[in-house]
Amino acid sequence: MLSMGQRGFWDEQERVAKLQEKKPVLTRLTESIPWESFRPLLDKGYSQERKSNAGRKRIDPLILFKMLVLQQLFNLSDEEVEFQVNDRRSFEEFVGLGVMNDIPDATTVAFFRERLRKAGVIEELFEMFEGYLRDQGLEARGGQIIDATLVPVPKQRNTREENKDIKADRLPDGWEENSNRLQQKDLDARWVKKNGINHYGYKNSICIDAEHGFIRRFVVTPANIHDSQMLPMLLDPENQDNYVWADSAYSGQCFADLLSLGGFESRIHEKGSRNHPLSEAAKERNSVRSAIRACVEHVFGCMTTSMGGKLTRKIGLERNEAWWTLKNLTFNFLRYLQRSTNALTLA
């Protein structure tokens, strides 16, 4: 007999049913994203020869992939995602595990991501979902919007001489002999000053299509690489319309010539100078362009507020490229859901 305040089996069933009625984002991701179509790529990246059939059975790579997606949804470390899958029913159900299953530990998650990175599979996962979007009638249309956001990483505690060597692409004295220390040093992250504030880390430059708002192309670079240098790599020739929107960092005759050569029509913000201020007509054109260009700011806003922020704790350009490929892919998952409703509740 249940005492006052105790919950019975039917109470628990009713609780689960009420939670499912809310259709939280993890439930909708489970139902809407073609997870099984990723399996061949995941198997290719995670395949490894077994010397015998003894030992622990290999974990389903789809479970591990969903844990990587959870990391990006909430900006979790490997240790945090292990804990949260253990702690939260919704996380456990999303990855496809039950209370009687063992949860993959942080080391397994990190090892899986590294195997995918080294096999070049993470980029293929992004491209595969891009193909799925096209098959669903969500081709890139309406022109493209290009922008970049700074990606902060933990600051390195180096001496002035060590930083000088790193900036000159030289390995500081003594680091090569100390492999443990070298593994903890980021030789690729760089400082950059923006609006009078110093930032340390990387940069995620993206191209979204103006009609649907999906990330179609992206490039991850050290923070000191100027936004405009990535323009040739970001332009999407598959967009069905030829307009290109970007802020004034991408302005200049050389970029105008590049767009013209590629058959694109520039909608890049015009930039004035000390002796040649913008005319009223140019200011009006910029105002109209800003209304459209704001769509790309919504992408970065989602990553900052809804996806746990942009701080990344990976070391080196290659690992940050892998991390942000997964981040951009996960954003596209959310954007795919958002097309059916504006209500996304991550909890």
Q: Model regions: which residues?
A:
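Short hydrophobic/aromatic-enriched beta-strand-loop microsegments
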Residues: 262-270
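Basic, amphipathic alpha-helical segments enriched in Lys/Arg and hydrophobic/aromatic residues
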Residues: 258, 262, 282-347
